């Protein structure tokens, strides 16, 4: 009896070709697994295609709710933005996909897991590290990393075996999408000087096609988790979709970024993430009101590390769990509502309120009702500047700090 390999199957070029290649190269029975993390795809057709191209069995697993509650919500609490720009949509989904693949491999008694990642991308690291962490006994096969074919040659290989492919040499964009965002690469986008053509975008309107009137959006949070939009309590999936639709209508969420990949190269990436950029910005605004200065400063360091952990494929690491403990604690009082104004491809926070706000109007105002005692400032300034004053008296100041008198 042939050994079984569980293949992460998207229905695209690489994984469709991989079904036949795995059978040819290893003589294995291929079990295709397609994971729904919010992809806008016809999963019935993908399952049928997997069987048609030679898979012995095909699974479709809907994990959207788990993705939102156990991954996206954590990313919001951590304000996760790789290099301050990318909200990590693809990177966030990979550990969940790896987990489901391992679960099915165990159920099926498979000896290997295969994926369609190339040798240049980050996803190969995310899948391999995740699988090795969860099930080190399983063999990992990456056909696109091993077969040595160019994209055009892969198309020819697929056509040779009668495998339909959804792309052409003239329009060779590689697209990945889920609840949290959409990434587009390859083709003309590989030249960072080229402006993305309109066909690259699917979720966000071009500025010239957005409404002339701005739109206000209110997002309510409970302990760091978004729970309502414009006063309406929504499920996680419905809430993300609601913000996605409103932000996309106004052209919000386009990202054009030259990114430092984990494998050591720079890559030009185009992203659409309307819900992600709006919800993270709203969350940051609420934190600015409810966390102390020292909490915010320390959390910013944690956020950078947390984002790197996600990007670098270390979701299942002990460090991520440790940082989660701090982040969860920091969200105890991050409850309230943030109002945003969206218009013509941009947005900004225009209001925020919280029962746990550390903003005290009586202390901040310069008008009637001022409760701040200005006489307290004198003693504070004396003590605050004492060390700098003493050091200047006891140690010579560098000449360049004094200014060149000659």
Curated annotation (Swiss-Prot):
SUPFAM superfamilies in the cross-refs: Adenine nucleotide alpha hydrolases-like, Argininosuccinate synthetase, C-terminal domain
For L-citrulline, which residues are the binding ones? 86, 122, 126, 174, 183, 259, 271
Location in the cell: Cytoplasm
| Short name of any one Pfam family annotated for the protein | Arginosuc_syn_C
Q: Which residues bind ATP?
A: 8-16, 116
Similarity comment: Belongs to the argininosuccinate synthase family. Type 1 subfamily.
Quaternary assembly = Homotetramer.
Task: Please name the HAMAP family in this protein's record.
Answer: Arg_succ_synth_type1
Protein name, per record: Argininosuccinate synthase
Q: Which organism is it from?
A: Dehalococcoides mccartyi (strain ATCC BAA-2266 / KCTC 15142 / 195)
Q: What is the lineage of its organism?
A: Bacteria, Bacillati, Chloroflexota, Dehalococcoidia, Dehalococcoidales
